[in-house]
Amino acid sequence: DQRHSLMASVDYSYGTGKKYNGPILFGRKVLQDAGANIIMTAGSGTPYSKQSNITQEAASGINDRSTLEGSLNGSRLPWQFRLSMKLNKNFVINWTDKKKSNLNVYVQVQNLLDAKNVISVYRATGNPDDDGYLTDAAAQNSINSKNDPDSFRYLYSLAVNNPSNYSLP
């Protein structure tokens, strides 16, 4: 249930032959039959159900019950933004007088601005890389009773920092 979704595309290509209106370097039409395309996409966040209590999300084998805060799907993830670009150039390859081929060479860059788009969060904090367990006052006795509490905190923070909570770069 994404409420708002925007997409814009800008495409510009130089022509060939007499239609070419681009730069000429050393007598050559360097951008002849070349083009650029930029695509911008943006969207409002999707819903999730916020929980009121902290649970141990990154530990396996732990079955904590979560308590709903607010209404079902009453919270929203942040907006997402992505800018991508594609540059291309066509080349004509003449094999013989009657036989020729077209070759299109392009470079495509996804997520040009390297935006960190959040696609999932921990329901208690609304944060993509912290479930709140390590700083929860109620969890401190359990954490301090571990064989090595500092090691537990370090390894738990690694497990909570899940790259799957972000879109691909």
Question: For each of these PLM feature ranges, what is it?
Answer:
Residues 70-74:
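Extracellular loop and loop/strand-boundary signature of outer-membrane beta-barrel proteins
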